[in-house]
């Protein structure tokens, strides 16, 4: 009983067996270890683990959950999948006149925009339609998402990142108001009568900065037709200002934009907007396709596009379990797809909406690393290039610009209040690839978390492992002080070996107790205790990696599951 209490007290003060560089980064950050999950290993399913800290603890993932959504979509649909939007007609076309309705069925293409309208109108005209004596009917039944928004999440329901999904998406649900003060102009970028703009701006002869550089925007969406009020004083020296907000329903915006494009092309429409499913007997006119999925998921990852991720989740639900798509179907689809790949062995994550804009999503570093490893082995660089490239593009373009990490990391980031996460791959200077997952859920400040992540990733670039397939922390410097070595016969001759393999079983802020060391002796292990930043217990030496790895499993089972292989000069211990 006494031994159990002593061991429990010892383990309570024990620091997980982490490489010195990572230990130092954590200490520098002043973030409690309980707030941090780390899982770093050689890339690939059989890669050796380098660092593990709370890797099985559920965390708020924020946008790194998109990795699961994106990978499941690629597995199910393929890189070349394209979203469709189908155009039908009812009635007949006589002498260039459609006596019937133009019917549009949306299947959730999140990229459909006003830039697609010229091509769509051209194909309508090419079908022999010069005017439409009927309505424009929109079928948005492929998604069953209701009208709930995320205003309860952060009280910014009109911000583009909060845009909710719709099967008839248009311009990512964002309405753009163009303000040009030096021309005294306020216009809608795309014709849209589903909302009203009231211009109450006062132009003043002041420098374009501070409170004179941008309009005050007030939105009233309590009415059937939302109203936008532009208020305040703005410098007449300011250039164009684009106000981009979620103001109205995307299917309404699509209707007004399509109708305006048709009429501008000389195709008048006599009817109005109708919402219903495609009538039986409707004739297919043509199908408009999105860009390939590979392009879309790249934007989803690099720009962390929440709307795209939501649509991917819903699409998977419909493809797996039939229309209409629902969030629950989508969640189940992602779980089933990833389970089939064997990457949800340890714990089932809670995916929620697929984009990470949620306080209910939960994920472990280990599961995320498993997904990244599977994707790495299956698709290699094609997959990696979907993620943000350090110092080059996406959410880590500025973060690692001008650092040693530039062009050496492919990452997905995730940020919410009290959550700062990053996951992906790092290429070290010696050409090896590592899977890196760092999840920090803390109240100590996201800036501290970002700095910690940056330090660890920079350290990984300089990290040197052993021979092929060996993952080890930095070598202990020759100045490390030997504290104690037991008297069991060594496994390798110190006369002939310059370096040998060791198993680091623990790292302590205080010198480990005799009870802990006696446990190792009673198990028949050779060990050494060295001191640099912490007191580290190393079992070994072993002449080959195979010998060391055979022992590693036993130590992880009976001593410390965070134990790992390392490699040192034998002279350090003599």
Predicted regions and their residues:
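Short active-site loop at a secondary-structure junction
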Residues: 52-72
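Extracytoplasmic
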Residues: 200-210, 340, 466-499, 508-574
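Conserved serine DD-peptidase/penicillin-binding transpeptidase domain
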Residues: 20-26, 76-345, 463-483
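Sec-dependent N-terminal signal peptides
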Residues: 4-13
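Small-residue-rich helix-loop
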Residues: 49-52, 303, 313-478, 483, ...
């Amino acid at each position: 009983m006494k031994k159990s209490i002593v061991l429990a007290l010892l383990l309570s003060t024990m620091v997980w067996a982490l490489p010195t560089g990572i230990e130092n980064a954590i200490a520098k950050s002043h973030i409690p270890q309980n707030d941090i999950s780390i899982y770093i290993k050689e890339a690939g399913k059989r890669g050796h683990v380098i660092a593990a800290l709370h890797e099985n603890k559920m965390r708020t993932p924020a946008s790194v959950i998109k990795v699961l959504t994106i990978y499941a979509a690629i597995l199910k649909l393929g890189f070349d999948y394209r979203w469709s939007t189908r155009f039908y007609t009812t009635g007949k076309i006589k002498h260039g006149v459609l006596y019937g309705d133009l019917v549009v069925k949306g299947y959730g293409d999140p990229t459909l925009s006003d830039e697609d309208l010229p091509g769509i109108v051209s194909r309508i005209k090419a079908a022999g339609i010069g005017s439409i004596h009927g309505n424009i009917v929109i079928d948005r039944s492929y998604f069953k998402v209701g009208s709930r928004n995320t205003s309860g999440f952060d009280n910014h329901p009109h911000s583009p990142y909060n845009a909710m999904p719709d099967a008839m998406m248009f311009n990512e649900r964002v309405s753009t108001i163009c303000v040009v003060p030096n021309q005294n102009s306020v216009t809608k970028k795309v014709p849209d009568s589903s909302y009203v703009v009231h211009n109450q701006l006062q132009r003043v002869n002041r420098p374009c900065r501070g409170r004179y550089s941008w309009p005050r925007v007030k939105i009233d969406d309590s009415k059937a037709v939302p109203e936008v009020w532009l208020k305040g004083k703005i410098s007449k020296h300011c250039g164009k200002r684009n106000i981009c907000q979620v103001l109205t329903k995307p299917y309404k915006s699509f209707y007004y934009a399509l109708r305006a494009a048709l009429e501008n092309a000389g195709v008048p429409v006599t009817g109005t907007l109708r919402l219903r499913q495609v009538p039986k007997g409707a004739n297919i006119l043509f199908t408009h396709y999105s860009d390939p999925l590979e392009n879309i998921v790249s934007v989803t990852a690099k720009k962390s596009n929440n709307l795209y991720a939501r649509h991917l989740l819903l699409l998977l639900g419909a493809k797996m379990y039939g229309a209409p798509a629902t969030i629950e179907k989508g969640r189940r689809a992602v779980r089933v797809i990833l389970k089939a790949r064997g990457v949800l062995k340890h714990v089932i994550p809670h995916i929620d909406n697929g984009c990470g804009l949620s306080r209910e999503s939960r994920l472990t570093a280990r599961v995320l690393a498993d997904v990244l490893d599977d994707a790495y082995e299956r698709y290699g660089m094609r997959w990696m290039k979907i993620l943000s490239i350090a110092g080059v593009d996406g959410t880590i373009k500025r973060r690692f610009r001008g650092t040693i990490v530039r062009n050496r990391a492919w990452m997905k980031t995730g940020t919410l209040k009290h959550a700062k996460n990053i996951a992906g791959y790092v290429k070290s200077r010696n050409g090896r690839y590592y899977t890196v997952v760092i999840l920090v859920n803390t109240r100590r400040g996201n800036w501290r978390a970002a700095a910690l992540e940056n330090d660890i990733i920079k350290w990984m670039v300089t990290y040197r492992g052993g021979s092929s397939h060996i993952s080890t922390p930095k070598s202990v410097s020759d100045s490390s002080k030997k504290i104690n070595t037991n008297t069991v016969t060594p496994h390798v001759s110190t006369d002939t070996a310059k370096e040998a393999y060791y198993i680091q079983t623990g790292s302590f802020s205080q010198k480990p107790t005799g009870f802990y060391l006696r446990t190792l002796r009673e198990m028949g292990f050779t060990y050494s205790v060295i001191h640099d930043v912490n007191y580290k217990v190393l079992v070994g030496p072993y002449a080959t990696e195979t010998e060391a790895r055979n022992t590693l499993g036993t130590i992880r089972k009976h001593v410390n599951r965070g134990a790992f292989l390392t490699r040192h000069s034998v002279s350090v211990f003599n």
